[in-house]
């Protein structure tokens, strides 16, 4: 049996760690690592690459074995870091195909204030909201 998990989704604060990701510290979900450690299931990182109209290629990286992290106190964070490195591999291979809608780097990158003394722009990006 297999389970597919989108490992780059945003999660609650208690279910993520801050790790280097694409050159900056980012919030990385620990849920995939928790699941793998709890079930002793290998993680198979896969990426679907668009090659043309209605044409895709599935790329699989080497499996990540959770067993080597099971007895470590830092195991959850270390396994999460290995998952993040696998995501980086797929993203940097075809960066134009990575679609991200969450603010992964939100802690570091706050909106710039364009006019000194003016309030920051609304979080939804519009001028006004009913």
Each model region followed by its residue ranges:
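Non-catalytic C-terminal accessory region of glycerolipid acyltransferases
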Residues: 1-130
């Amino acid at each position: 049996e297999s389970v597919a998990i989108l490992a780059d989704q945003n999660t609650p604060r208690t279910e993520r760690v801050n790790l280097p990701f694409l050159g900056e510290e980012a919030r990385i979900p620990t849920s995939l690592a928790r699941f793998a450690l709890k079930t002793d299931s290998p993680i198979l990182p896969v990426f679907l690459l668009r090659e043309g109209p209605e044409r895709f290629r599935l790329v699989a990286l080497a499996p990540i074995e959770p067993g080597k992290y099971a007895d470590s106190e830092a195991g959850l964070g270390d396994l999460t870091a290995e998952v993040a490195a696998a995501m980086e591999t797929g993203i940097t291979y075809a960066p134009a195909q990575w679609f991200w809608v969450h603010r992964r780097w939100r802690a570091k990158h706050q909106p710039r204030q364009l006019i000194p003394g003016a309030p920051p722009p609304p979080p939804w990006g519009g001028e006004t909201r009913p």
